[in-house]
Curated annotation (Swiss-Prot):
The lineage of its organism: Bacteria, Bacillati, Bacillota, Bacilli, Bacillales. InterPro entries: Kinase-pyrophosphorylase (IPR005177), PPDK_reg (IPR026565). It comes from Bacillus subtilis (strain 168). Keywords: Kinase, Nucleotide-binding, Serine/threonine-protein kinase, Transferase. Bifunctional serine/threonine kinase and phosphorylase involved in the regulation of the pyruvate, phosphate dikinase (PPDK) by catalyzing its phosphorylation/dephosphorylation. The gene is yqfL. GO terms for molecular function: ADP binding; ATP binding; phosphotransferase activity, phosphate group as acceptor; protein serine/threonine kinase activity. It is an enzyme of class 2 (transferase). This is Putative pyruvate, phosphate dikinase regulatory protein.
Length: 270
């Protein structure tokens, strides 16, 4: 295997194919040092394939490839066999077996692994954003967010932020309390990005009483006082009017239902 070249051909980045090739090379003592792995990514035309086959024929190289488009894959195999060039299809046979096993047809779209990776990292980024800018912790997040949720205590701001983060939306939430002026950023944000979470006084009274009980506290505390709750909700309405944002009533809705409404509003406003 001295001075051998292995051509790694892919219709995407080619990382998968290169890792497989290097894993195989590691089984031959010292051979990896004498073998050059040359990656050729984003191959989408037969012209590039012809060039690679010519190079491999000239220097006795091997072609290893991950090509998912059937026409391109079949062309490489046919031309390599005509030229007596060694080749190995890394992904094709596995896709064929999976089609048989699942009774489904593959999408045959190059780069789907990278698309999935990007989707995953966007989701992680959104979740981290929701944690960082939860409960008005840092008002700078308001202007960076895709969605800003506002509401009095116990209107599901935090669980909604996390749920929407799993849809790759960056969400900041801000508590509305009569004794505390909302951050100025809240009045500078695009009103279409802001959603007010409305709730009926009786429903909120019940939720807060149950919350106090779960903490082993007296449910007669001011936190669950109906007059105090009405005062908070009146203040909330004033802030909503000042911002000019949309409102979603969360009184009798599950988090998932409210999140889907908010997601729909966000999509409609794009």
């Amino acid at each position: 295997m001295n001075n051998r070249i292995i051509y790694v051909v892919s219709d995407s980045v080619g990382e998968t194919a290169e890792l497989v090739v290097k894993a195989a090379l590691s089984q031959f003592n010292g051979s990896a040092d004498d073998t050059h792995v040359r990656r050729i990514p984003y191959v989408e035309d037969i012209g590039t394939i012809n060039e690679v086959i010519s190079l491999a024929k000239a220097d006795g190289g091997i072609i290893c490839f991950t090509l998912v488009v059937p026409e391109i894959r079949e062309y490489l195999i046919a031309e390599a066999e005509k030229a007596n060039v060694l080749y190995y299809d890394i992904i094709g046979p596995l896709i064929d077996k999976m089609e048989t096993a699942y009774g489904l047809t593959a999408k045959y779209e190059p780069g789907r692994v990278r698309q999935l990776d990007e989707d995953y990292f966007k989701k992680v980024e959104a979740i981290e954003f929701a944690v960082k800018y939860d409960d008005g912790r840092d008002p700078r997040g308001i202007l960076k967010a895709d969605i800003v949720l506002i509401g009095v205590s116990r209107t599901s701001k935090t669980p909604l932020s996390q749920y929407l983060a799993h849809k790759r939306l960056k969400v900041a939430n801000v508590p509305i309390v009569p004794e505390v002026d909302p951050p100025e950023e809240l009045f500078n944000v695009d009103p279409k990005k802001c959603i007010g979470l409305k709730i009926s006084p009786d429903k909120l009274n019940h939720i807060r009483k149950e919350r106090l009980k779960s903490l082993g506290l007296n449910d007669k505390a001011i936190y669950a006082n109906i007059n105090r709750i009405k005062e908070e909700l009146e203040y909330f309405e004033k802030i909503v009017d000042r911002i000019g944002c949309q409102v979603v009533d969360v009184s009798n809705k599950a988090v998932e239902e409210t999140a889907n409404i908010i997601h729909h509003l966000k999509t409609k406003n794009i």
